[in-house]
Amino acid sequence: MNNNQFHELFGSQWPPDQHGGHSSASTMLHQQTMPQTMQLKREPHTEVGVMHNQMGMDITSGSVADSTSPPPGSSEGMFGPISGMFMDKKAANSIRAQIEIIPCKVCGDKSSGVHYGVITCEGCKGFFRRSQSTVVNYQCPRNKACVVDRVNRNRCQYCRLQKCLKLGMSRDAVKFGRMSKKQREKVEDEVRYHKAQMRAQNDAAPDSVYDAQQQTPSSSDQFHGHYNGYPGYASPLSSYGYNNAGPPLTSNMSSIQAQPQAQQPYDYADSTTTYEPKQPGYLDADFIGQVEGDISKVLVKSLAERHANTNPKLEYINEMFSKPQDVSKLLFYNSMTYEEMWLDCADKLTAMIQNIIEFAKLIPGFMKLTQDDQILLLKSGSFELAIVRLSRLIDVNREQVLYGDVVLPIRECVHARDPRDMALVSGIFEAAKSIARLKLTESELALYQSLVLLWPERHGVMGNTEIRCLFNMSMSAMRHEIEANHAPLKGDVTVLDTLLAKIPTFRELSLMHLGALSRFKMTHPHHVFPALYKELFSLDSVLDYTHG
């Protein structure tokens, strides 16, 4: 793959946003907004309708107004030096155009500037204005956990408004406000990232296969066409943005276990050698330099933020581990039947996977893969990423795990009626503990999840070339992070070598989980699992996890 084709993997709508709620497997993958807010301060001498940005300029939705007092000094950055009492319309429009490179924080559509204190599109600006101009009483029909993205933003007004408020949209922000230096730097980082994408896009091949695959509709197109021919709720995956829930998958457990394992595309014989796929490379040296220079640092920073926004906060985890154990909750879980514990674990895993889907959307280029490949990667990789995420919830010194809102001794979690189930649970905790002992940073955990999800040659995917390019990009960033933060573990064996060597274990545990689920369903056919869990781990659509 040449430089031009590689860029087609990246959309102009990246990076996306956080989503704290839960829904089902397809809509979340098309949500592409960012979680940061722009907190705004009231200033007494600013005209109505004028918003000061952090660099002393006045921006309105339609024109540029002169300020009545000079800004407190001047600021220089990627937008250039700005000072003095007045700014001409041409200069303000130029800066607004640069901000508009960043997608709408609410739904991921093309933004039109800063509205109500947040970078949004015209559609979300108008929605928020209407919600604030009259008394509204929105109701959510789906547990207040709907995904708000370009496809589904009009389906639930309640969740859309909550997301606007969570991002920091405010009527006060229309009139007054300044971004802090930290917020300004975030915006500048985003603009740099999208400019790097645009530079690569200018050189993109006109016959790229992605040109015909995904076209981003404008705000007006979506606003007028949302309810015409919408596919509805065909499956749990449909609420994450997927029509028809992906390709039919008909292999079964017996065929998976009977198939010989394909040769793994990794080598550890010489751990001083950087990872290279066995097939020819798809990035030339010049483009690798551009990626590392223009994108890699922003990728690390952005993925770390999205990782933090789709996981329990470290402060909360540490607080829970520092509290005395809640005896009543311990007794409650100890009194659970085998069946109750199975279903409770399925609920907890489903909630985690909902956030994993949110995170996957934020991996640059993931949303440019075909819909079928996105679904296949999630079906085959979501359980593996759950193991990685579990490592954050384990205290390896005390042998404890944060399970929901209670800290449990790990030894209490590995008791099972069937020795095979016990081996599964024990294997999961051992894998998670081994990751926790490496003391990865949040950035490294985020990149590691990207590597696990995008591991090349997963069975059934069609876009292996594109997936491999995305994998290489995450690998490059991960290598830089590990080299900067970790010394070799033993001899020339690095932390990265160790992490890559764990991925086959994740595959084995995924298969063991499917086997345990199969046995449980045979003995308890009437128990109902969460829809997303049933869809991802249905034995009617099992993937060959052992391939690749």
UniProtKB/Swiss-Prot annotation:
Intracellular or extracellular location(s): Nucleus
Gene3D superfamilies membership: Erythroid Transcription Factor GATA-1, subunit A (3.30.50.10), Retinoid X Receptor (1.10.565.10)
Domain NR LBD: 295-539
Biased composition (Polar residues): 211-222
Main location: nucleus
Signal sequence, start to end: none
Function: Putative receptor whose ligand is not yet known.
Record protein name field: Probable nuclear hormone receptor HR3
Species for this entry: Manduca sexta (Tobacco hawkmoth)
Lineage of producing organism: Eukaryota, Metazoa, Ecdysozoa, Arthropoda, Hexapoda
GN (gene name): HR3
